[in-house]
Curated annotation (Swiss-Prot):
Homodimer. The keyword Kinase applies. This is Pyridoxine/pyridoxal/pyridoxamine kinase. GO terms for molecular function: ATP binding; hydroxymethylpyrimidine kinase activity; magnesium ion binding; pyridoxal kinase activity; zinc ion binding. NCBIfam families: PRK08176.1, pyridox_kin. It catalyses: pyridoxal + ATP = pyridoxal 5'-phosphate + ADP + H(+); pyridoxine + ATP = pyridoxine 5'-phosphate + ADP + H(+); pyridoxamine + ATP = pyridoxamine 5'-phosphate + ADP + H(+). InterPro entries: PdxK, PM/HMP-P_kinase-1, PyrdxlKinase, Ribokinase-like. Pathway: Cofactor metabolism; pyridoxal 5'-phosphate salvage; pyridoxal 5'-phosphate from pyridoxal: step 1/1; Cofactor metabolism; pyridoxal 5'-phosphate salvage; pyridoxine 5'-phosphate from pyridoxine: step 1/1; Cofactor metabolism; pyridoxal 5'-phosphate salvage; pyridoxamine 5'-phosphate from pyridoxamine: step 1/1. CDD domains: pyridoxal_pyridoxamine_kinase.
């Protein structure tokens, strides 16, 4: 192996603004396969760490792949430090996790990382399931999120169903959802963005609710009828990008929602089953 060594000057290492830890597909636009190009459109450097590697989502007639083995997963994380690629790291985001053991490995890595990066923004999308499908991850993942990742996160982005699972509370109306979100706040966890709160069905609206200790902001967006997958992953990519570019939380959430709507409508124009990113207009 040593005879192949070419790059040993760590001062030349490419640096990341963001490490994105979530699923990856060979075909399609979910997980890091949509998040990475979206983040790069915002002019930020991102390193993608896969938790599962799949041919495509399970919504097609064939489907291959699975969770990344723990040895590989821990090695991917360790290698970023061995390459000295995290000197300028500002944020870590997480999405779909393959196993509870991955969550524990990631939490241990984040805990060590925070010693050198005390201001690191950790944003967790606790992907567990939704109202229509129920839980679609391994049954031990919700407890792993509660035990390992929520105590490290500064912000989380659950949907209503995931908020119910994490808190054990009914969240089907706005007041109860807000109360449940507030019950999760702590010295570390500063905000919860509920990504699918109750909206106005008659007016074709959906709501995103931003909950912190000091305020609650309800943001309404037009509802787009679609079966497109990966919109939540895109939302989180846009949200973390907006925050790192200096936007206030509620403004970043609003802008992320508008961008998702723009991408969905653009994709529909091309009659595609997978999200297509249009160029990003500078504000």
């Amino acid at each position: 192996m040593s005879s192949l060594l070419l790059f040993n000057d760590k001062s030349r290492a490419l640096q990341a603004d963001i490490v994105a830890v979530q699923s990856q597909v060979v075909y399609g636009s979910v997980g890091n396969s949509i998040a990475v190009p979206a983040i790069k459109q915002n002019g930020l450097n991102v390193f993608a760490v896969p938790t599962v590697l799949l041919s495509n989502t399970p919504h097609y007639d064939t489907f291959y792949g699975g969770a990344i083995p723990d040895e590989w997963f821990s090695g991917y994380l360790r290698a970023l430090q061995e390459r000295d690629a995290l000197r300028q790291l500002r944020a870590v985001t997480t999405g779909y996790m393959g196993t509870a053991s991955q969550i524990k490995i990631l939490a241990e890595w984040l805990t060590a990382l925070r010693k050198d990066h005390p201001d690191l923004l950790i944003m967790v999308d606790p992907v567990i399931g939704d109202i229509d499908s129920g839980i679609y991850v391994k049954p031990d993942l919700p407890e792993a999120y509660r035990q390992y990742l929520l105590p490290l996160a500064q912000g989380i982005t659950p949907n209503i169903f995931e908020l119910e699972i994490l808190t054990g509370k009914n969240c089907r109306d706005l007041d109860s959802a807000i109360a449940a979100a507030k019950s999760l706040l702590s010295d570390t966890l500063k905000w919860v963005v509920i990504t699918s709160a109750s909206g106005n069905e008659e007016n074709q609206e959906m709501q995103v609710v931003v909950v912190s200790a000091d305020s609650v902001n309800v943001i309404s967006h037009s509802r787009v009828k679609t079966d497109l997958k990966g919109t939540g992953d895109l939302f989180c990519a846009q949200l973390i990008s907006g925050l790192l570019k200096g936007k206030e939380l509620t403004d970043a959430v609003h802008s992320a929602g508008l961008r998702v709507l723009e991408v969905m409508r653009y994709t529909q124009q091309y009659d595609s089953d997978e999200l297509i990113l249009p160029p990003l207009a500078e504000a």
